Amino acid sequence: MAYFKLVNFNGIAPQVSPRLLGEGLGQTANNTDLDRGVLTPITSNSTIATLNAQARAGLYRYDFGGQVYNLEFTNAVNVQPGPVADDAFDRLYWTGAGFPQMGSSTQLLASGSGAYPRSFFRLGIPAPTSAASTSITSGTDDGTQTQYSTSYVYTFVSAFGEEGPPSPASTVLTKVDGQTVTISGMDTATSKSNTNLANKRIYRSNTGSNTTNFQFVKEVSLATASTTDNLNNDALAEIIPSTYWIAPPDDDTSTYPNGQMLGLTAMANGIFAGFSGKRICFSEPFLPHAWPVAYRITLEEEIVSIAMAGQVLFIATKGTPYIAAGTDPQSMSVVRMEAAQACLNKESLVDMGDLAIYASPDGLVGASGNEITVLTAGLITPKQWQAQFYPSTIKGFLWQGKYIGQYYTGSAYGAFMFDPRGGKNAFTTISSLATGHAQGGFTDPDDNELYLIDYDSGGGNAQVELFQGSTTNTTQTFKTSQFVLPRP
């Protein structure tokens, strides 16, 4: 009498014939947790919050004052906490919700009703458009003092102390120490919406033996259109630091025809990265409002998404991927990788820690350092991948070291779990990632849990579900390989 002894249970490998599957591999492994090598069902999700609308695709859990607030967005967003340690304002920065945005706890959690964030500001400080007018209004030149040819610029400064690029320079005038200059005609507002401007800083040119620099004169309120300067030349303070600190690409289509910056990502040394069209952009270190043009690099292909992959920035495109590496935005190097693995969906790209994973036409691709690998090769053929997992629709999430993917067939949603650490239990399927389907989600680094936005097809508001947050088991299915026995 024939019998079978099944000791280990592992994942699936559709590429391999059911008769040739290795020990423990199955034809089906659905809703099952195989980390311990035994059949254990995954549990259902638990609902932990209700959002303020049905259509929600972005979520960020903001911990403030010992309480967690769900920040919700209509679109998929990239949210980053500020790079400054112990930030007194508890600022967040994000892209994907229109022009790049930011806010402190005061804006995010403002009193009132409705969804968080309650308010926000535009990321970046605009330059004043009007040059100041200047004239000498007191003091005389008796011909015995050194004359200086000088002009003035001024900058806008936010309530957070962020400084923007300068105005056009005023007409040059000639003065000597002891004379007072009246500076007038300065802008008291900007045409940009959602700004947080509070003050202006005024600088005066000072010509040395080799160069001419603008040096600090004074700071005045935003509402001040006219002021005076009677500083002697040797009393001028620091050189203007913000000459090239322009805002990131925004909704000004005349300047940025490829659209606003997307994909906000935190790199080492306080540098932020983002992209617009084919252009990858970097911020000044620890100054996320400052994005000099000199720190922007144009690639050959349109960028789809970006993520950290170990110590380098991985740049997924519609064709060949790239990596960017460096510790200073002035010296970033960008290298095109030798792998034609396009990213089919920006939401499939996930930072897994040591590597980034995304959906390509051939399977799940992993990028780490300067290496790129089709991780599902040997498990799923490219043809099976396209036919069964619809990679152009995949939304990816990180959960406890595993890649969780949801796809859409055109009529139904499905999901899978992939462990990039490999092994025979690397790939399993999930019947449904959320009660309805996941519109988006957020992996909270504080607890390593995955929070999903569940869509209510009945018209109700979206809900936040904790992945496998309940104690109720799902129905698991495991189908073994085919066993072929000799005729009796």
Residue ranges and their predicted role:
Residues 1-97, 149, 159, 174-180, ...:
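Beta-sheet repeat architectures centered on beta-propellers
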Residues 1-36, 42-45, 50-270, 276-277, ...:
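Disordered, low-complexity "stalk" and linker segments at domain junctions of extracellular
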Residues 93-94, 266-267, 271-275, 313-317, ...:
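Short beta-strand motif characteristic of blades in beta-propeller domains
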Residues 220-221, 255-256, 295-299, 336-342, ...:
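Surface loop/turn motifs at the tips and blade-to-blade linkers of beta-strand repeat domains
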Residues 307-310, 348-354:
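Loop/turn segments within WD40 beta-propeller blades
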Residues 313-338:
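Surface-exposed extracellular loop regions of Gram-negative outer-membrane beta-barrel proteins
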